[in-house]
């Protein structure tokens, strides 16, 4: 028998038929054809489409019954080229305006897979569209030639899907609208026209294939080279979307973004913090700037998390006048990077002049705590983040700067209406906002600032007199065990005259603080502010290095009391009723009014005011507080509990709750008729009474059945409440 080969029958519009051999790629050849494939030159065979949209002919594989030699192959090849040149002009016109039959020839990947398994079925289903055989080309050796489905022509590979080998390819082609010239083997695949001249030159452009996550700047599902081509096909937007779902996104070599390193991807994926940074789009606040920014890459979305603030990109929250000051250290607010807890004093230069005014900008650059990370905030707005948020509340009656600040705190359904000053508690800062500089992130940071803002040495003046902001009593904790009173005095004497005190100092007759802490009683409030300026701030706490005979430069904690932390108004629209106020005993001294108010509001709701009792001379907390409710139900629920667990930060203490007893109330029964108009000495805290009684009315009312076991509450003279220095708006 003679030799058998395979040929392709091509039928054109003129009716001429020519058969010439075709050699298939080993990956794309059916299993039963491997032995019979002849090593002939590769060619691309395009089937023409009739004018009515139906297929004028099909390309089928058939066994050639007659033998042939090399001369027959040469003659057939030249004849095919001449026929293709004659058909080139009408073919280009037909490809520029695809017919509905061509649109219907686009199949999803699942149908392509079925077409590979059943060649006969796929050929019958694609009878309405153009067909092209994907054949090995010597020019494309080493490249996985990938056709752009829906770009220019709607061709369908009959043997294998092109996307099955894209993982091993680094190059792909961007097909121009007219691709019929690819059959010319002597045509070059690299044109000098570039992307803008692709349609004019009728050539193919080769671009590197990159993973979709490497080029986030282009955004969406459109690659760079698809954009120019899409201008020639505005009536087929679904082609590009369909094409982008089944093929990898392409990257132009001219793209400003760096190419990926595929050989490092495995190592990066093993490190979670590095793998996440590779897969996320760059933050608009990052240090890398694209040389040719596009609208889609200028504001690419960042990751989640504090994000709105850019925490994952190492964005520094400290901002200058116009947000353009580069920080000394870009420290993540959610990560600490200290090797030890020891603080070296030589890193921080103390100010030469304690009261020399300087600009807030200079102070922010020279601040000692600029090297330390920001205070750790496990929750965005909890009580720890409100440490210096509400400043000088109810003490700003004559201050010219007042504002209504809306702030939502955890567990609340409405925002807080706070009548507060706009400057911070210390160093001109306030942690009401995540940014420590206290400026709103809405463009208002450029407006003129108050003279008391920004510098730790600038004090607020009222009617020519300086307003006190701190108590003259300061807590000092973590003292060296061998330090005595004289050494403590010598360590803090440079800030001003002071007296060292600690609990039970007179009874103990000891020169050493028994529990490692003491109180500094300064003569002037300005000494406290000078002490604060000399401290080091870390995690929201102040430290100062103190030396003893055996320990040198030991950091001790400095805990001043801000006078604005004594009162907090949560709801200024509600009237303050003493009959709906509770007394909280045993309040830890670090707890502030804002924290006490939020704890009680979370437990019982309806809190409109909270206050910390302070001594009238030094204005330091005495260990008790008051909470006023806006409704009777919350008030009764609080006094019925009798005990409350105060939990905040390092504070976890069980405190007692009682009705707040006043000593200037008349008897609710006789209105002073039986007692001669004297104030009622007794108050019944039982929920069935909740009234003030004189001695006569108490005996008469509580002699009844069921009330004989009620116990009166007596307000002692020493616990007389101080005047509340605020007024309702």
Curated annotation (Swiss-Prot):
Q: What happens when the gene is disrupted?
A: No visible phenotype at young age or under unchallenged conditions. At 80 weeks or under high fat diet feeding conditions, mutant mice develop hepatosteatosis with excessive liver weight and accumulation of cytosolic lipid droplets sometimes accompanied by fibrosis.
Annotated residues for binding of Zn(2+) 2: 684, 689, 702, 710
Q: Where does Zn(2+) 1 bind?
A: 667, 675, 694, 697
What tissue expression does the UniProt record report for this protein? Highly expressed in brain, including hippocampus, amygdala, granule and Purkinje cells of the cerebellum (at protein level). Expressed in spinal cord (at protein level). Expressed in kidney, lung and heart (at protein level). Expressed in liver (at protein level). Expressed in spleen and testis (at protein level). Weakly expressed in ovary and in granular cells of dentate gyrus and the pyramidal cells of CA3 and CA1 of the hippocampus.
Please state, per the UniProt record, what induces or represses the expression of this protein: Up-regulated in granular cells of the dentate gyrus of CA1 and CA3 after kainate-induced seizures. Up-regulated by high-fat-diet and aging-induced endoplasmic reticulum stress. Expression level fluctuation follows the circadian clock amplitude.
Segments of skewed composition (Low complexity): 83-96, 285-300
Site positions per UniProt: Important for the positionning of RRM1 relative to RRM2: 561
Which regions are flagged for Gly residues bias? 301-311
Family per similarity comment: Belongs to the RRM CPEB family.
Q: What is known of its domains?
A: The 2 RRM domains and the C-terminal region mediate interaction with CPE-containing RNA. The interdomain linker (564-579) acts as a hinge to fix the relative orientation of the 2 RRMs. The ZZ domain (509-566) coordinates 2 Zn ions and is probably implicated in mediating interactions with other proteins in addition to increasing the affinity of the RRMs for the CPEs. Unlike in CPEB1, a continuous polar interface is formed between the 2 RRMs.
Spell out the PANTHER family in the cross-references.
CYTOPLASMIC POLYADENYLATION ELEMENT BINDING PROTEIN CPEB, CYTOPLASMIC POLYADENYLATION ELEMENT-BINDING PROTEIN 4
This protein is called Cytoplasmic polyadenylation element-binding protein 4
Gene for this chain: Cpeb4
């Amino acid at each position: 028998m003679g030799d058998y080969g395979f040929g392709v029958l091509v039928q054109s519009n003129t009716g001429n038929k020519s058969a010439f051999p075709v050699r298939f790629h080993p990956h794309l050849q059916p299993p039963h054809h491997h032995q019979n494939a002849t090593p002939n030159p590769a060619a691309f065979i395009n089937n023409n489409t009739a004018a009515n949209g139906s297929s004028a002919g099909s390309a089928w594989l058939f066994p050639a019954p007659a033998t042939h030699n090399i001369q027959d192959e040469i003659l057939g090849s030249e004849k095919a080229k001449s026929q293709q040149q004659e058909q080139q002009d009408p073919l280009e016109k037909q490809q520029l305006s695809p017919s509905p039959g061509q649109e219907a020839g686009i199949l999803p990947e699942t149908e392509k897979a079925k077409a590979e398994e059943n060649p006969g079925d796929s050929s019958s289903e694609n009878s309405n569209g153009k067909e092209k055989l994907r054949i090995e080309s010597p020019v494309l050796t080493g490249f996985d030639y990938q056709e752009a489905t829906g770009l220019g022509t709607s061709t369908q590979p009959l043997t294998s899907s092109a996307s099955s080998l894209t993982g091993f390819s680094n190059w792909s082609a961007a097909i121009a609208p007219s691709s019929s010239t690819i059959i010319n083997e002597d045509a070059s695949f690299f044109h000098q026209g570039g992307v803008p001249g692709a349609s004019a030159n009728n050539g193919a452009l080769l671009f590197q294939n990159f993973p979709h996550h490497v080029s986030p700047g282009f955004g969406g599902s459109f690659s760079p080279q698809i954009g120019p081509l899409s201008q020639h096909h505005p009536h087929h937007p679904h082609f590009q979307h369909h094409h982008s779902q089944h093929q990898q996104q392409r990257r132009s070599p001219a793209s400003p973004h760096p190419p990926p390193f595929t050989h490092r991807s495995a190592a990066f994926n093993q490190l979670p913090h590095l793998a996440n940074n590779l897969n996320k789009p760059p933050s608009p606040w990052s240090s890398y700037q694209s040389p040719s920014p596009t609208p889609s890459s200028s504001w690419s979305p960042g990751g989640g998390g504090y994000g709105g603030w850019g925490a994952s990109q190492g964005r520094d929250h400290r901002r200058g006048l116009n947000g353009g000051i580069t920080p000394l250290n870009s420290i993540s607010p959610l990560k600490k990077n200290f090797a030890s807890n020891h603080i070296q004093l030589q890193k921080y230069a103390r100010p030469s002049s304690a009261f020399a005014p300087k600009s807030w900008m200079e102070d922010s650059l020279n601040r000692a705590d600029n090297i330390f990370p920001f205070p750790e905030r496990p929750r965005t707005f909890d009580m720890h983040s409100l440490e210096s948020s509400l400043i000088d509340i109810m003490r700003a009656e004559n201050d010219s700067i007042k504002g209504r600040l809306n702030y939502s705190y955890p567990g609340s359904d409405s925002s807080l209406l706070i009548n507060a000053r706009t400057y911070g508690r210390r160093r001109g800062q306030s942690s009401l906002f995540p940014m420590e500089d206290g400026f709103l992130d809405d463009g208002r940071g450029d407006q003129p600032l108050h003279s008391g803002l920004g510098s730790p040495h600038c004090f607020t003046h009222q009617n020519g007199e300086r307003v006190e902001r701190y108590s003259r009593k300061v807590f000092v904790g973590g003292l060296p065990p061998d330090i005595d009173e004289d050494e403590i005095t010598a360590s803090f004497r440079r800030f001003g005259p002071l007296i060292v005190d600690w609990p039970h100092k007179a009874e103990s007759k000891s020169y050493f603080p028994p529990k490692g802490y003491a109180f500094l009683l300064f003569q002037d409030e300005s000494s406290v502010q000078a002490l604060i300026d000399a401290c080091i701030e870390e995690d929201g706490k102040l430290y100062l290095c103190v030396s003893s005979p055996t320990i040198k430069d030991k950091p001790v904690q400095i805990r001043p009391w801000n006078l604005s932390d004594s009162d907090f108004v949560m709801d200024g629209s509600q009237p303050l009723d003493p009959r709906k106020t509770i007394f909280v005993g045993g309040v830890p001294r670090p707890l502030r009014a804002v924290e006490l108010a939020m704890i009680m509001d979370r437990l019982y709701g309806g809190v409109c005011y909270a206050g910390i009792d302070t001594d009238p001379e030094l204005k330091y907390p005495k260990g008790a507080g008051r909470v006023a409710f806006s409704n009777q139900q919350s008030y009764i629920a609080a006094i019925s509990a009798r005990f409350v667990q105060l939990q905040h930060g390092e504070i976890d203490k069980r405190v007692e709750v009682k009705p707040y007893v006043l000593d200037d109330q008349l008897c609710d029964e006789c209105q002073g008729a039986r007692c001669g108009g004297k104030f009622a000495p007794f108050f019944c805290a039982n929920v069935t009474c909740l009234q003030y009684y004189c001695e006569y009315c108490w005996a008469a009312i509580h002699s009844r059945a069921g009330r004989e076991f009620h116990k009166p509450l007596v307000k002692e003279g020493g616990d007389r409440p101080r005047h509340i220095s605020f007024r309702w708006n």
